């Protein structure tokens, strides 16, 4: 909702800290893990099913980045991993890789009886994701794994603080995701971010936190829209695609929309839309809410 780009390592190194306000939505990724004990499948083979199917004998040969880094880290014996999600998530801007990564860490650690708390999973998740996406920031991993509407502060020493915000605030809206139909590479966009311009995003976080605490809906919506305008100025790639520019203009003109912004690094994915809680007109947008649990783990 506010502060995106200040969670990037380069920004934190330059300015000492970064901060965001975010929430996990109730669109999930799922990892199911199966260990063959009866020999019905190959006992010495790793099987991964996602948009592709992989069958390998060594983890180093796994093409799926998430499956490979997690299984290698835990030195996990051969298992079957199945990846599922509620929406098509590749290049979506919905932090799907971080969500899958946290779910995979949870599934494998549970399978191996390795006890890990949420913060330990976040620290490991960030370390592992940076092996295949070195520019990834803090907010995706920590935002996916921690519950509710909150402010996260990322410090230069690597520590992260969590401050929960009033849970009922977002009940005053109906929230939607509008797909752009455009997939994008977050790495390309993140590498183009101007950290000097991103500094202007930090004040929005503290002001928005204050508005939420005071239940000031009008101020919250104004800050969200204003921060989106500043966000667009931090990189020419955020709205590089003409279709995105057209959609952005269209959303501004829609009187039912109180505020909107593009999710993720930019240049594709989904727009997040806020409407009044009493809005009842049919829409093609995907309705969302705040996730009751940040991640789900299924162990078979």
What does each model-found stretch correspond to?
Residues 6-13, 22-23, 30-75, 85, ...:
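C-terminal nucleotide
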Residues 18, 268-269:
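Glycine-centered small-residue motifs that form tight turns
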Residues 90-92:
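Helix-loop-helix module between adjacent transmembrane segments
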Residues 99-111:
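Stable alpha-helical structural segments in soluble proteins, enriched in small hydrophobic residues
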């Amino acid at each position: 909702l506010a502060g995106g780009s200040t969670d990037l390592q380069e920004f934190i190194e330059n300015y000492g800290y970064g901060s965001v306000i975010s929430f996990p939505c109730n669109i999930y990724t799922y990892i199911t893990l199966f260990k063959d004990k009866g020999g019905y499948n190959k006992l010495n083979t790793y099987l991964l099913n996602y948009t592709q199917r992989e069958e390998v004998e060594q983890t180093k040969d796994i093409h799926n980045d998430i499956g490979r880094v997690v299984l290698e880290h835990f030195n996990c014996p051969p298992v079957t991993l199945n990846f599922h999600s509620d929406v098509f998530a590749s290049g979506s801007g919905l932090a799907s890789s971080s969500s899958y990564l946290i779910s995979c860490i949870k599934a494998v650690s549970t399978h191996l009886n390795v006890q890990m708390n949420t913060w330990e999973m976040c620290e490991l998740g960030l370390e592992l994701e940076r092996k295949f996406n070195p520019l990834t920031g803090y907010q995706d991993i920590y935002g996916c794994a921690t519950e509710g509407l909150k402010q996260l502060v990322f410090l230069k020493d690597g520590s992260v603080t969590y401050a929960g915000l009033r849970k009922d605030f977002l009940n005053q809206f109906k929230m939607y995701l509008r797909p752009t139909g455009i997939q994008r590479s977050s790495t390309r966009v993140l590498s183009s971010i101007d950290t000097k311009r991103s500094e202007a995003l930090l004040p929005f976080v503290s002001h928005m936190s204050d508005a939420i605490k005071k239940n000031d809906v009008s101020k919250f919506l104004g800050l969200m829209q204003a921060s989106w305008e500043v966000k667009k100025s931090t990189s020419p790639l955020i709205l590089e695609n003409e279709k995105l520019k057209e959609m952005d203009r269209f959303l501004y003109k829609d009187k039912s929309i109180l505020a909107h912004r593009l999710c993720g690094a930019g240049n594709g994915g989904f727009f997040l839309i806020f409407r009044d809680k009493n809005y009842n007109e049919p829409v093609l947008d995907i309705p969302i809410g705040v996730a009751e649990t940040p991640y789900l783990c299924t162990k078979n």
